[in-house]
Amino acid sequence: MMDSDDDMLDAHDMDSVDYDFDSGGTDDDNDIDETDYVFGEADTDDAAIIAYHRSQINYVVLKEEDIRRHQKDDVGRVSVVLSITDVQASLLLLHYHWSVSKVNDEWFADEDRVRRTVGILEGPAPDGREFTCGICFESYPLEETISVSCGHPFCATCWTGYISTSINDGPGCLMLKCPYPCCPAAIGRDMIDNLCSKEDKERYYRYFLRSYVEVNREMKCCPAPGCEHAISFAAGTESNYDVSCLCSHSFCWNCSEEAHRPVDCDTVGKWILKNSTESENMNWILANSKPCPKCKRPIEKNHGCMHMTCTPPCKFEFCWLCLNAWTEHGESSGGYYACNRYEAAKKQGLYDEAERRREMAKNSLEKYTHYYKRWASNQVSRQKAMGDLQKMQSEKLRKLSDIQCTSESQLKFIAEAWLQIIECRRVLKWTYAYGYYVPDDHTKKQFFEYLQGEAESGLERLHECIENDIEVFEFGEGPSEEFNHFRTKLTDLTSITKTFFQNLVKALENGLADVDSHAASSKPANCKPSSNTKDGGKGKKEALTMAGSAET
């Protein structure tokens, strides 16, 4: 483990190749080291949210106005080319899943068929002075009725109720048709604008906006609750699908779960399913209980005596060891705290299989509990770090700036450290899901646990520095000469931790591919040397180089 700041600084200075855990990697890396942090406020007024962007990103965060602009551009292009209104162009694009080329191809191939299919009709002009509404059956003058392209008249009140009900029912309102039976005429945005309440309009245009994103293969809505942003992703040869929204939520473009590097999407799916099913409950029952010999109900032994009594209505009394009736037990069977029958049967191998299954279930449960607790603990720590970051920005930054007589922009290194902690907590969290599926008897397991321990040690050092060392400057009476030393120390720790974690991610994503070849010539004990000896430092270097040589 990293026992001193000097260890981390020495590690950072070591020569390395590619994802040697002590280097910054090559200049063309697109991983978590290539990150520029941008500070900004979210759309909500009650919280300041930090969002970071990669310097070489393969995605763009789109706000609502950006999506509307894209929509408006597509609608305008169709409207101009086909010489139709924007409302009609919107109906066509909705029908053809916002594909401008598909709309143009279908329209010029058979305009009449497209009009009938979409519901853009050219109905007869009304020729009467008074009409009967087809919904409420009241008579109205012509000027008080409304119709779409089909010409079927309905009163404004019935139109409003009909459209409002459809909007409240969900996104199907985007394809709403005339209420006249079997009429295919489409209802466009102009009707919503003229007849609906402000609340209904907002809901309708929210559906309208999302429809543009949902059918676009290069866009996805941010899955964070209440977020209206979308991500435009440019797929390439990189396997990094992690994206970060302006709302501070990071997720995987490929599976839409939260960002989970270095774990692949299939493993994440298995882990989440395991956390949400009853499988571990069954493992606990199997490991800590035995079935009643009569009713087969699982029974947990919670007292020292071997005399067990099943709950009503069964009430069967039996021996916990051999599972035979208690009436058959006594001094001849070994007394109340032992069972000669069980010992004899065990020697004959009669109970080996049941005990083996119970022991396997117990070990499986203990393993899962070990990894799940640490997975969940890092998530809690990450959430706390996010809260500390927001508190620092909203409350402490200005105060620290005043005390140290420096501008807030010069304190950016503090926010960068917190952001690195948040990112490292996320990575560390998912290393426990990764570790759960690494075979226990594999050489990679030992090396993985060594690297994970190094990562935890380095992160704790950074966390301790920003939480504890900064306090003396937050509550000082004036500028301190030691503040520049603190700045240098925190900046160095942030850089070293960032480098270590970005190389850890790369190594795990590569499956620690080179470990097997090194295992043949290196003892597993070398993976975790003592940091108190000179030879131990050499062993650490060799272990770190082991991971770095995979891409040599």
Curated annotation (Swiss-Prot):
Entry keyword annotation includes DNA-binding: no
Pathway in which this enzyme or protein is active: Protein modification; protein ubiquitination
Assigned keywords, A-Z: Metal-binding, Repeat, Transferase, Ubl conjugation pathway, Zinc, Zinc-finger
Superkingdom of origin organism: Eukaryota
Catalytic reaction(s) noted: [E2 ubiquitin-conjugating enzyme]-S-ubiquitinyl-L-cysteine + [acceptor protein]-L-lysine = [E2 ubiquitin-conjugating enzyme]-L-cysteine + [acceptor protein]-N(6)-ubiquitinyl-L-lysine
Top class in the EC scheme: transferase
Compositionally biased tracts (Polar residues): 519-534
GO cellular component terms attached to this protein's record: cytoplasm; ubiquitin ligase complex
Zinc finger (IBR-type): 202-265
Cofactor: Zn(2+)
One GO process term, biological-process aspect: protein ubiquitination
UniProt EC number: 2.3.2.31
Binding site for Zn(2+) 5: 292, 295, 310, 314
Binding site for Zn(2+) 1: 133, 136, 155, 158
Pfam family, one: IBR_1
Zn-finger (RING-type) residues: 133-183, 292-322
Domain free text: Members of the RBR family are atypical E3 ligases. They interact with the E2 conjugating enzyme UBE2L3 and function like HECT-type E3 enzymes: they bind E2s via the first RING-type zinc finger, but require an obligate trans-thiolation step during the ubiquitin transfer, requiring a conserved active site Cys residue in the second RING-type zinc finger. The active site probably forms a thioester intermediate with ubiquitin taken from the active-site cysteine of the E2 before ultimately transferring it to a Lys residue on the substrate.
Family listed: Belongs to the RBR family. Ariadne subfamily.
Record-given protein name: Putative E3 ubiquitin-protein ligase ARI6
Species: Arabidopsis thaliana (Mouse-ear cress)
Gene name per UniProt: ARI6
